[in-house]
Amino acid sequence: YANLAESYSAIPSRLLAITHGISAVGKSSVAMRLVEALGALRFRSDFERKRLLGEQDSEQQNTLGGGIYNPNASAATYQRLHALAADALQAGFPVVIDATYLKSEQRQAAWQIAESTGTPFLILDCQAPDEVVATWLKQRQAEGLDPSDATAEVILAQRKNLEPLSPEEIA
């Protein structure tokens, strides 16, 4: 029991962790492990986007970067995630934001929240081989339970637009 108690004392009472990676790479699974280990609150971009903007209609689903995924909608989604995280951190909770964070400016905005609340910041960089991502995407689509609208086409575009972590973000 002493070892268990000691291990709990090493866990910060507050932290902000964000995921980084393309869709279907396993970000939600990694995020859930941290949520379970720390008792953290998790905010998912897939849910918050639809809460904020509604479901995407079938016409928009065929337009890459359109509908609820246009740049303004994405910016609003990240602003919402960051506002939720800031409130939770100020209330003393550890937080995990489950989103792609493909752009450096998105990650920088999350870091600024951690900085302003005096909270440790962690980036969970999630990667997997293309074949594994394709398999996971097919499984997810077959199950039909995941809120993500990502398709193989979306994943290709994400790979192309992903801004790698900077040396400062890796350190």
Feature map (PLM): residue ranges:
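Conserved substrate/cofactor phosphate-moiety recognition/catalytic segment
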Residues: 35-93
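Hydrophobic positions on the alpha1 helix immediately C-terminal to the Walker A/P-loop
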Residues: 30, 34
